[in-house]
Amino acid sequence: GTFDRYDEDFERKIWSSTGVNAIEFNGLTDLANAGVFGEYTYHAGDKFSAIAGLRGDWFYGQGFKVSPRVTLKYTPVDEIVIRANGGRGLRYATPLVDNIGVFSTGKEFVGAYNDHILEDAWTFGGNITYYMPFGASSNTYVSFDYFRTQFAQQMVVDYELGHNQIHFYALDGERSYTDNYQLDFSVD
């Protein structure tokens, strides 16, 4: 488990045409979680392996949450490796700590900048690698990866919503995702 204590104490003065806008924030935040993790590994010769993991965490103020994950690896022939994996990730958002650059903008903070929501995301994807029979060693390959992260709960720092303002808000289940593609070629 972890125990993080954030003592956030700041005073910002923002000069504008309407005068000085002062924001003061003094907050001591304790973010605690305790958990246990276990995994099982299965091998079917040299062709297939699977790792299944399960993590259970108690989050302060949120209760007990379960985070499963699985990794699969299949090698149909020596030159080709296929991998797939997926799982859930949970963490407390720390909007000001995670986005320290907002202090240098001179913009007003609006919304939940001092909230520490529990972010919840699922990531899944895969990889296929083909090892090529040339180069100085057997490590010459071409590889393609695709991964998607789908957020069920996410803290957003929005620089675009308001003029001279930075908005902090939780998506609360609204659509938020990332898709990552990568093609890699390596000659050794």
Residue ranges and their predicted role:
Residues 3-9, 54-60, 86-92, 101, ...:
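Transmembrane beta-strands of outer-membrane beta-barrel pores
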Residues 1, 52, 70, 84, ...:
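Membrane-embedded beta-strand positions of outer-membrane beta-barrel proteins
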Residues 40-42, 56, 64, 72-75, ...:
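Residue-level signature of outer-membrane beta-barrel architecture
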Residues 34, 66, 110, 122, ...:
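Exposed loop/turn and edge beta-strand positions of beta-sandwich/beta-sheet ligand-binding modules
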Residues 30, 34, 57-67:
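Solvent-exposed loop/turn segments connecting transmembrane beta-strands
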Residues 9, 75, 81-83, 117-173, ...:
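Membrane-embedded beta-barrel scaffold of Gram-negative outer-membrane proteins
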Residues 1-50, 169-188:
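Outer-membrane beta-barrel transmembrane domain signature of Gram-negative proteins
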Residues 9-18, 62-68, 95-101, 108-110, ...:
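Outer-membrane beta-barrel translocator domains and adjoining extracellular loop/strand segments
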